[in-house]
Structures are given as structure tokens and as C-alpha cells.
């Protein structure tokens, strides 16, 4: 299994319950599609380097997990994160061992 890290930026004006539901939903997408050893946590609310969708800051969330390279977890997360309006940006990185 390969270790991956996902960083995504959540819009700053989301309420706490909606943010918790969003994080739970996307963590579920990863685990339901073959990811293991998921560790998910909020990083912090930070000022953005440039404006994204009229927002000047965002809530950074980071998730680390292990998955097979052929796993659907990465492609499904990427597909749904692009559609979701609460996620401003996301990045998936393969962690070197």
C-alpha cells in the first residue's frame, strides 16, 4: 500500500455542524473505497495567498491514509471534491517512504 496525503481548503463561512458533516462525508468516501489507516484533522484557518471564489481565507483540513495505487479512493475523492462548493481547493500527494 502507498501512503497519501490530501489537503483541502473549506470555505470559511461554513458552520461547525456542516463542516463536521463535510469532513465525515469525505473521510467516508476514502474508507468506503479502500483507504486504510485514515488520520484526518483540521489544520487551521488561514489567510489565502490569493482570493478564491471571493474568499480571502479558508479552513485547511489534512487527511493521511494508505491505499492501493489502483484504488478508487483517490479518483472518487478527486471527482467529488471538484463538484462540492464547500471545498475551495484540494491537493492529493503521494508521501515518500
Curated annotation (Swiss-Prot):
Assigned keywords, A-Z: Ribonucleoprotein, Ribosomal protein, RNA-binding, rRNA-binding
Keyword Ribosomal protein: yes
Keyword RNA-binding assigned: yes
GO cellular component: cytoplasm; ribonucleoprotein complex; ribosome
Transmembrane feature ranges: none
Coiled-coil regions, chain positions: none
An example molecular function term from Gene Ontology annotations: small ribosomal subunit rRNA binding
GO biological process, one term: translation
A Pfam family recorded for this sequence: Ribosomal_S6
Domain of life, per lineage: Bacteria
Family stated for the protein in its record: Belongs to the bacterial ribosomal protein bS6 family.
Function (record text): Binds together with bS18 to 16S ribosomal RNA.
NCBIfam families linked to this entry: S6
UniProt xrefs under PANTHER family: MITOCHONDRIAL 28S RIBOSOMAL PROTEIN S6, SMALL RIBOSOMAL SUBUNIT PROTEIN BS6M
UniProt protein name: Small ribosomal subunit protein bS6
Native organism taxonomy: Bacteria, Bacillati, Bacillota, Bacilli, Lactobacillales
